[in-house]
């Protein structure tokens, strides 16, 4: 069996206009990503402001993206919650809508044990029967998938990838050593570490900044896959990422997607948009980046 997923996936933002989902902007954004050859789209994840979307909104966004993509790249639906029953229900709806895979975050707030993680993920994976990408992001959940647990979970035929947002290369290298990477994918969940991640055997990235610069990130991956050095190519992207670090994701990236015409610059509470001075500085940095001057 070969790996199902690799390359640049985009953690899609949800465009709003007057606090409602802007489906016209969503369609434009998806076309922009596809025209720049990204290799998968993740819908309803952290960057999509998942907690502020109703179940109906999540389903409608997924329907719109699945229709727009029309089989050209895999669509991965973020369906994980901190309740197994709710996650399973969302995953089954995603399957019915036409998602190619689901992404499951580790349960948060009501943290479980490593045994509980195995039970949670395998219950959903076995019942849904779609490829599963696990999402390990301890900075947001205060919970991690231990290496031994990941090895056990990878025995499940439906669990085919991990989005690793630990930024821990000891963890990454242990996974690389112990998993069969002929049919399992290691995705970085951190834009800022991709040079090293690709060099040390990572199969791709699920990117935030690629919402705005998909072509540049895809070119970076393709160059790395050819065995070419990408350090210099990454330097201006790194400076753009520094500018984006002004606030928590997805507040800054949505300022850039607004510049590109994908909805207004809006986020839903409890998130708030950047202060006007910070937004101005970020947009100036982005303009310099696009002009090749950053």
Swiss-Prot record:
The active site is at residues 135, 163. GO terms for biological process: diaminopimelate biosynthetic process; lysine biosynthetic process via diaminopimelate. PROSITE patterns: DHDPS_2. Gene3D superfamilies: Aldolase class I. It catalyses: L-aspartate 4-semialdehyde + pyruvate = (2S,4S)-4-hydroxy-2,3,4,5-tetrahydrodipicolinate + H2O + H(+). It comes from the Bacteria. GO terms for molecular function: 4-hydroxy-tetrahydrodipicolinate synthase activity. Its EC number is 4.3.3.7. The keyword Cytoplasm applies. Keywords: Amino-acid biosynthesis, Cytoplasm, Diaminopimelate biosynthesis, Lyase, Lysine biosynthesis, Schiff base. One of its GO terms (cellular component) is cytosol. Homodimer. Catalyzes the condensation of (S)-aspartate-beta-semialdehyde [(S)-ASA] and pyruvate to 4-hydroxy-tetrahydrodipicolinate (HTPA). Belongs to the DapA family. This is 4-hydroxy-tetrahydrodipicolinate synthase. It comes from Staphylococcus carnosus (strain TM300). The lineage of its organism: Bacteria, Bacillati, Bacillota, Bacilli, Bacillales.
